[in-house]
Amino acid sequence: MYGSIFNLKPKDGKKDELISHLKNGQDIPYGGVGWYVLNPDNDGDLVGIAIFKDKEAYVKNAERPEQHENFMKMMELLDEEPSWNDGRFVIAENL
């Protein structure tokens, strides 16, 4: 599996709107395994995880026009571009 762990820094007063944006219209694309967004107890930046079956599926998703459009809408709610940590998941266990 391949994917990204990323931080989202919402503009002041925009966290709830950002969460709503992320909830709506976010279908898992072909090759996607799942994705998650964490709202930390310390009220810091949101933390996201996107998981794909492999790097090829991850790259194909990033290149989709719909993904770019969604990213641009998300950027309107952020102070800065997300920080991305892309790589291969080496341990995964489900309960």
What do the PLM-derived regions correspond to, one by one?
Residues 1-2, 94:
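N-terminal short leaders/motifs
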Residues 2-8, 34-63:
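Short, well-ordered beta-strand segments in beta-rich or mixed alpha/beta enzyme
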Residues 24-34, 51-85:
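An amphipathic, aromatic/His-enriched active-site/gating alpha helix that lines ligand/cofactor pockets
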Residues 51, 87-95:
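Short, low-order "capping/linker" segments at domain edges
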Residues 43, 86-87:
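Short, charged, surface-exposed hinge/linker loops at domain edges
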Residues 7-18:
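Short, surface-exposed ligand-recognition loops at beta-strand->loop->(often short) alpha-helix junctions
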Residues 19-23:
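Short amphipathic alpha-helical segment that frequently serves as the phosphate-/nucleotide-binding helix
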Residues 12, 42, 91:
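Residue-level detector of flexible, active-site-proximal loop/helix-junction positions
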